[in-house]
A protein has these predicted regions:
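Mid-domain alpha/beta scaffold segments of enzyme catalytic cores
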Residues: 1-136
Length: 136
């Protein structure tokens, strides 16, 4: 949360905010988010790898570490995950691979996913369908 994280929380609480969701965008950010989670204080975490950072995530190397994070108390979602075909900071096939792995992880753990979608509507819907998502 940075140097003034406590001040930010205090101002938010004074304004009536009672719950916070801290999202991870890399494996390291997700570790930080999970460490900040304190359900008794209304602080929760989402762990994930943003599509810009997908190039740095290898499921075979990082998957067990990530899944252990996702199982920690106070982690309530997988995210921010998805596809970003506007900037292409990570190759599109890699973005899709990581998204589908993260969706599988969310399904295994029974957690919702926080999705990022930029200029990838058809592709993200196809990935969701491949991973068993359905309309309610």
């Amino acid at each position: 949360m940075g140097v003034d994280g406590s001040a930010l929380l205090s101002r938010a609480r004074a304004a009536g905010v009672t719950r916070f969701l801290v999202p991870g965008t890399t494996l390291a950010d997700s570790e930080d988010a999970a460490a900040l989670a304190d359900p008794a204080a209304g602080i929760f975490a989402a762990v994930g790898v943003h599509p810009h950072e997908a190039k740095d995530f290898e499921p075979a190397r990082d998957g067990a570490r990530f899944e252990a994070l996702a199982r920690r108390p106070g982690v309530v979602a997988i995210g921010e995950i998805g596809l970003d075909f506007h900037y292409d900071h990570s190759p599109r096939p890699k973005q899709i691979e990581v998204l589908e792995w993260m969706l599988d992880c969310a399904a295994r753990l029974g957690l919702p996913a926080l999705l990022h979608n930029r200029e990838s509507g058809e592709e993200i819907l196809a990935a969701l369908e491949r991973r068993g998502a359905r309309e309610n």
